[in-house]
């Protein structure tokens, strides 16, 4: 995503915002690698700049198909005409890896052919859709530049240990971690390590629109609550810990998001929203999800 600072600010607090600076660094490195491989004279003659490199990379990343076999990912004319819509699939694309499983006898399925077949009835003039798989709006915006209003089930928010540090402070959470290690000494090794990986290995838990909060996160909160009771030497309620963590996650979005996103105007091909509206939608849907699980 090659947005300026003003547009990126619309994503503050979202799961996507954290990835953008990483993307910038990766693109800079890839650009230098390509430029060094071509040599300065050739790169200049081709007009290769960081901006033209980003433009080309964005086309390849958003429109390439994984064909399989020795070909890997390819840009395929016509196959990239189909937009994505969650829950709708008008066509299916079969690559070389699917040929062995194909039982069609109507010809055309050779080892170097990409086949597109209709899988749903369509009327003349209707837009046909492919599917890019079940993805959150944050993922769709990151990879393809658009979001969908109806894509609520795939909204995802991650819960990291840093949220506990926001609430209780790093020093206290170190003490909580030490207390948890002692309390888990007699626990089954796999379960013990699964809980401690939250502190030791960058493990995180997900909240999704379809499934809510992962069950194991509640088990973790219960263990952290017990450790807090020991560290603070006072009564602590599990629900208070959970609500404090959700509030800390909500605080990262800053000011309240707009309650609604304008759906007016001409939508892009495939429907949905792009640009500032898309960023606001990602932020609003994540905040709605957090408020829902907090209730």
Residue ranges and their predicted role:
Residues 1-295:
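Long, positively charged leader/targeting segments at protein N-termini
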